[in-house]
Amino acid sequence: MRTAYYISDGTAITSEVFGHALLSLFTIEFEHITVPFVETEEQAKQVVKKISESFQDDGQRPLVFYTIVNTEVRKIISKSVGINYNFLDQFVAPLEIVLGVPSKPEKHRTHSIHEKTYDIRIEAVNYALANDDGSNLQEYDEADIILVGVSRSGKTPTSLYLALQYGIKAANYPFTEEDMGDILKMPPALKRYKDKMFGLTIEAQRLHQIRSERRANSRYASLQQCRMELREVENLYRKEKIPFLNSTRYSIEEISAKILATTGLQRKKY
């Protein structure tokens, strides 16, 4: 197994995102080690020592992805035995040439509370939590989007990801067996918000597996029940012309990106 380090003088989120994106292209198993807030030369030396230990243990040079502003700290990391990828050097220098202005790197700027849209993200997260699972319908006027679907189809994690990553206020509403009766109809409380709605669906077998982890051997988790509920919600989506997505084979990140591409919603984070 190859070891990959993600190092930064901040949260290391940027290093992780870039590094994971690159490594996901390879069918190799990695041990991922994240080291945030490396801000002093002494801390950098400790990290270099740890990289050397990984090399001795694995017999392979670790991959080292890092974003560090301080020049001296960066030099120390660059001298590790790992195969080093300095994202600042890789991308910033060419951008300075293209843009015609020098960069002004600052620690913690990318993911800090001083980021001007920080409050937007926090407000969106609070909104998603307060409007989870059909609660607070009176606040739906504020929603940028309302995710609908059967229980355990991915509405809550997607709502939270949209809030945290994009600053989007996402409410979610579950269609339950009680809503269905003989046939599922649009709940009266949702009719005025139809233009904000986006549906999630999922393969019945996968829904059965997810529900069984929560309530094994229950009617709620039975394959027959899952098939019935999914059939009803998909019929409603088509009848009401609600855009929808089958989430079975997608990650939360992919689901969120597809929702934005389909609806035209714009991120508010930057």
From Swiss-Prot:
Keywords: Kinase, Nucleotide-binding, Serine/threonine-protein kinase, Transferase. It catalyses: [pyruvate, water dikinase] + ADP = [pyruvate, water dikinase]-phosphate + AMP + H(+); [pyruvate, water dikinase]-phosphate + phosphate + H(+) = [pyruvate, water dikinase] + diphosphate. ADP binds at G149, V150, S151, R152, S153, G154, K155, T156. InterPro entries: Kinase-pyrophosphorylase (IPR005177), PSRP (IPR026530). Its EC number is 2.7.11.33, 2.7.4.28. NCBIfam families: PRK05339.1. This is Putative phosphoenolpyruvate synthase regulatory protein. The lineage of its organism: Bacteria, Pseudomonadati, Pseudomonadota, Gammaproteobacteria, Alteromonadales.
